[in-house]
Regions:
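A structural "hinge/loop" feature
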Residues: 1-8, 31, 58, 126-137, ...
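N-terminal lobe/hinge region of extracytoplasmic solute-binding protein
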Residues: 1-40, 70, 161-164
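Extracellular/periplasmic solute-recognition and catalytic clefts
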Residues: 171-182, 199-257, 267-268, 276, ...
Length: 331
């Protein structure tokens, strides 16, 4: 699982130790109702909510997190986000096969309701990481009933099989048509869940989704066609709400490539991109040009890097690398 749409779906059905605060600020308690951090910032003790249940009635325990994190770090699973847990002592070594005993990894169950996590180094943002779906627990018995710990195609995620611990349960999954989730009456905070059902539609075309929203076929959409956004902003469309989105869109460069491993070549590519023109002439919906991976304003962070559009410098760097006027540069 990877991507923003999948994230929205998963947070409706699953819950980790903490929950992202929708109003910003520190994460809120999830399965963990409280936690303690050691003075050196390396040891966390989480106290789990005794009312936290799986959708089949089983209690969510500390051991569920231990097993689930072991699953994510199992190399043969091929998880997309094992590095989210690399902050744990021994996690990276286990995932890379350098150690084989998971008891050497910094997560353990003190008892059913206390989870101990040991980090390699102090990590001030660790609590925030715990709202990411890669750290969510999965129901061990259900996973193993329908496959193995590293089975990527097990049927444990199918309707009727899936056991979750979040506000919603999986009701239906019709491929390329819709996914329906319904209120989970066993969720520990069910009284505050206002929706009885959510239907997710896999609309691949932005214009189609926009028309569906304007026709009343969708209650919510976070997609606005590029050509429509400036019009909606200019006309002050009451249905348009723009909120800060902490996301960064970027090109990923293979630094092992014979050409791209040259730092000057990579700098040339960076100086050749007119970020300001992209957000002003292409996306046109209030985006900010990205000059750093971490968005400005993240927990008070302000980037001190700047890679302005400079085609002359880009050409010079390419020439110095043996690609004058771009000749010989692989495309």
């Amino acid at each position: 699982v990877t991507g923003v749409p999948e994230h929205h779906l998963l947070i409706s059905m699953c819950e980790g130790l903490t929950i992202a605060n929708p109003r910003g600020g520190d994460n809120l308690p999830g399965v963990a109702e409280s936690w303690e951090i050691s003075e050196d910032g390396r040891t966390y003790t989480f106290y789990l909510n005794k009312n936290a249940l799986w959708s089949n009635g089983d209690q969510v325990t500390a051991q569920d997190f231990v097993w689930s994190w072991m699953r994510i770090l199992t190399p043969s699973l091929g998880s997309q986000y094992p590095d989210m847990l690399y902050y744990l002592k021994g996690a990276e070594e286990f995932h890379q096969g350098k150690i084989s005993n998971f008891s050497d990894v910094g997560v353990s169950a003190i008892n059913d309701h206390e989870l101990k996590v040991e980090l390699k180094n102090p990590t001030p943002f660790f609590i925030r990481l715990l709202s990411h779906y890669s750290t969510y627990p999965v129901h061990k018995e259900t996973v193993l009933k329908h496959g193995t710990i590293d089975d990527r195609n097990g049927k444990w995620t199918r309707p009727g099989n899936f056991v979750c611990n979040g506000p919603m349960n999986l009701k239906a999954w019709e491929l390329n048509k819709q996914i329906i989730v319904e209120k989970n009456p066993l969720y520990w905070d069910a009284d505050r869940v206002r929706l009885n059902e959510i239907r997710y539609y896999p609309v691949s075309n932005e214009s189609t989704e926009d028309r569906m929203f304007r026709a009343g076929q969708l209650h919510v959409t976070n997609v606005v066609p590029l050509e429509k956004c400036p019009i909606y902003i200019e006309n002050e469309n009451p249905n348009l709400r723009i909120e800060p989105y902490m996301g960064t869109y970027f090109y990923r460069i293979n630094t092992l490539h014979p050409v791209l491993k040259n730092k000057d070549v990579r700098l040339a590519l960076a100086f050749a991109i007119n970020r300001k023109q992209i957000v002003e002439k292409v996306s046109k919906c209030g985006q900010a040009a990205a000059y750093s991976f971490t968005p400005p304003g993240s927990a008070g962070y302000e980037p001190d890097t700047d890679v302005p559009f400079n085609p002359e410098l880009a050409r010079s760097l390419l020439a110095d690398s043996g690609y004058a006027n771009g000749e010989g540069f692989p495309v």
